[in-house]
Amino acid sequence: MYALPLLVAAVAPGADVAPAPRPAEASHVEIRAAAGKALAFLEASSAAWRADKKCVTCHQVPFTIWALNEARGRGFAVDVKKLDDLTAWAFDFCATNEHEGKKTGGFHLTSVFLVLSQRGAPRADALKVYPFFETLFAKRQLVNGSWREGNQVKLPDATREADEVDTMWTLLALRELEQHDATLPLDTLRGLAAEHEKAQAFLKGAKAGRRIDWLALRALLDHERGPVPRPAAALAELRALQNADGGWGYVRGSESSPHTTGECLYVLTAAGATPDDPAVRRAVMYLLRTQRADGAWECRSRQAFATRPDKMNEVTSHWGSGWATIGLLRTLPRG
């Protein structure tokens, strides 16, 4: 075998031009196998967290429940009894505080992510807590219409951007609650509408900053009837920021993260991207390449871009692995 010299030549008018090579593609079998390993990791991790910490947290239990619900809708053998038990415990945890005899709700985004984990088919234990969540969201909404997570992740000097991210997540949860207008009390529905209106006013004129998740959330909200209907622009920008290895970083120009890549896969598929979409294929290949043997992904804390550049622990890996798993599952057919 020998090397051919490289030639630069003009293409004659009408000449056939070879199509650009397709990105490497994973089979459904490979994706299901990776997702299966990841689900096993998430279940074991959240069970240990529940037993040891007796806490839901924003990162551990909600994303296990969310991933298991996505898996169940795609034909995975999910232990429904265990899932129902975990769901009931998590929603009860976020609605009560047995030691103090009062309702708490936990951290704000814990409640938000639990609502989103039930998208489309909430269980009875979730539905009965939804009216309380509405009052909780109303109580926590700031005067300017935004929400702010108690343990907020933000870049230095970027509080407004972080508030917008937290607010967009909450808007998605409000929209999920609004889908159940036939089962929720009228006062709850009125409260949701008022909170929704104030949040939209806060986000009016918001501009993208450094964070990729801001852009992903903006694209998803726009797709789901956002205040500024420009889904094509937001999605196009999100696609343009995909790294050469197929992933997305936490901030523009940063190295790829399984956490953010899973979020972006979720958004792309929710906005209609199909499994053969080049951006989807590249992201799937990135996640398959970076998955550990135990089914998890190594994920640095988002505080790594602020004050904790070396932080990587079981919480950050579980949270990122949850998103990576959800992203992979979204590329598989339902049924």
Describe the predicted segments one by one.
Residues M1-A10:
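Bacterial N-terminal signal peptides
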